[in-house]
Amino acid sequence: MKGEEYIKNLGYDAFALTMTRNECDMEKLLSILPYKTIATKSGLGWIGRSALFVTPEYGAAVALGAILTDMPVEFGNPITDSECDDCTNCQDACPVNAINPQKWNDRLNREDIIDIETCKDYIIDQYKAGLGCTKCMSECKLTQEYLKKE
């Protein structure tokens, strides 16, 4: 909420879309205003084969947030197609084969690129065992390039 306060202190309206403010359907894993949509429309990156948001600099190792505001801001050109090449690391790493070979574009539904139910069920089972699954995120070659820089 510090970003919201900062913008308000500059004299603009602002509303941070926090987890509690951006209503989310946990069954479908969808929010009213999806951060990934905002980010692709702002030119920050694209949706990878894994349905995760991907940037050239960080790969899929990204956490998104959003602030609605009337403050003028600069943004890039909308990205409407995946910039992933023929790499299938995320797809190959998926333990439940939830990732489809279809590359993302902004005309597809999420279900066209990933079986979100299968993915969600696996993640829930892993969390019950005290684990998690970030295989698609960690195997993204752009994520690997970023991690090697550090």
Name each region found by the language model:
Residues 1-150:
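Catalytic cores of enzyme domains
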